[in-house]
């Protein structure tokens, strides 16, 4: 009997391409849930390249409803699948950050959630898939079906970027490596910390993402042309059929992006004038790199630690009296229009905190700090590569490193910091982890592949476009 594979097709189309290749070498029945917008949907309705047994369009299942949500159903669903539903929806970026387009009521959120739950549950009960292929979830509905599959014994394979560039990981979970049995006994290359850092720099993921995943149409003239085409010629039903587009009238979109453009320029001016671009490092310090907002890492990966300013305050309260906390803005935050000036001011007003410019070299901070603190990102791994202990707030795949410590209670942070000040990081442990990590990843350059897809299909001025099978 053939295996049944359910694919979640997101807007980057990687998994559609994966399904196309897989059907040539593996005897299986394939099904798909597609998230595409209205215009690319036409292609998926008629395509013959992939022999899907059935394709469901996610947004066709979610309707505007004025009735009360069925809380009895949601309560039973939550217990059946062991999923904290409020945690999912209250950290959904569409509900949190875009209220200037549309402010969802509590009942609207729950009605959307109920329809998602019923839709996913029916698919899983009807086809009973053996495998679920997806990318690492970044939106609540993606995380919902991901958890449903994991909690019902469906083998779940999620594609994700890795700690190193030009590589890709397909794994069942997010907090540990699928293959981690040989950490203490694995053969490894015995490199010094300097050699490890050179290796790390050759696979700089942040640098690669900045270079390859910048959307086309980035010049001022091209952005103006895109806006002109959108306002004059673009017509879409997404505002009625996709709750992620609710309220996005042309007028609102125009003024939102005009306002965003102006705010970004003013915020960058504030950053250039007020955030530090140099330091003598006269004081010992703990280093905390800010996470990007909006980002999966915090919204889904660490949902109870979204408020980074409160975390900064808690770290600052826990430092030894002679220490400072050095904060660095994430260079990728420019893609979110930077942060409000009030947030930067609030951080800089904390007595023992210094806020650094996004252009300040992160390697300099790693080399000179005593400890690295990270909510859930790669900084704790990079800290180990620089011979520095690290503190995280959740378990991560590199928490297997002896120098990476997960904080369970902020009341313990002061003592943990003092403990780590005398801890030495062993380069052998870092080399062991890198050897083990290599066994869990492939050399598929996902960001490069995504860039090629974008250039081929979405190089025009509008992203919601029709695509053809001929391409």
Positions of the model-derived regions?
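Conserved N-terminal ligand/cofactor-binding loop architecture of enzyme catalytic domains
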Residues: 21-120, 164-265
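A donor-sugar binding/catalytic signature common to diverse glycosyltransferases
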Residues: 134-135, 160, 358-405
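Catalytic donor nucleotide-activated moiety binding site of glycosyltransferases and closely related
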Residues: 313-357
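Leloir-type glycosyltransferase catalytic cores
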Residues: 181-232, 403-471
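Active-site donor-nucleotide binding/catalytic segment of nucleotide-sugar enzymes
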Residues: 280-309, 314-316, 329-333, 438, ...
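Nucleotide-activated donor-dependent transferases that construct or modify glycoconjugates
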Residues: 2-12, 34-36, 105, 133, ...
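Conserved nucleotide-sugar donor-interacting segment of glycosyltransferase catalytic cores
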Residues: 118-182
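Histidine-anchored nucleotide/phosphate-binding helix
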Residues: 9-26, 304-319
